[in-house]
Amino acid sequence: MILNCENMKSLMDFKHNNHQLAILNRQAPEDSNVFFSELNITPFSTSGYVSSENSLKDISKLTEEKIPSKIRKNLFFEKWLNDMSEICKMFCLFQEKDKISFWLGSERGCKRFHVDMVPYRCLVTYSGQGTELLPDNAADRNAFI
């Protein structure tokens, strides 16, 4: 059910097997704690499309007016944008698409269980609680179809 990956490239194997969830645990950069503790108390949400070719520019534009300049001036902000850009490029390659739908926010949108009606979802949690996949024996996967 779960594929534990060693690196981002190993995530590419996910769609060639029957796992339902792939997990890649990464080490948090030392200078990220202060940045994310400040970002987490700033309510924001932004969404749009991010192209593989212009991922850094697209993400920068999406966050430009949504994240306060004080946070944007933090030296870690550029590292964070670059990381999101690399993940988006990888997911475009994974999906074999030129662009992907992108959402970024400081508050969880889903408070309860739901079914995703998308073939694949790339969820990245930088700070705080992530997400949980219910095992098949705990969920009726056909109930919402």
Annotate each language-model stretch with its function.
Residues P68-E107, K111, V115:
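Extracellular-facing segments of soluble proteins and assemblies that are Gly/Ser/Thr-biased and enriched
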Residues E107-I145:
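Catalytic core of non-heme Fe(II) oxygenases with the double-stranded beta-helix
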Residues A22-N25, K99-L104, V124:
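A structural signal for short, well-ordered beta-strand segments and their strand-loop junctions
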Residues M1-P68, L75-N82, E86, M90:
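N-terminal auxiliary "cap/dimerization" subdomain that precedes the catalytic jelly-roll/cupin core
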Residues N18-L21, K97, Y120:
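Sequence-level motif detector for i,i+2 pairs with an aromatic at +2
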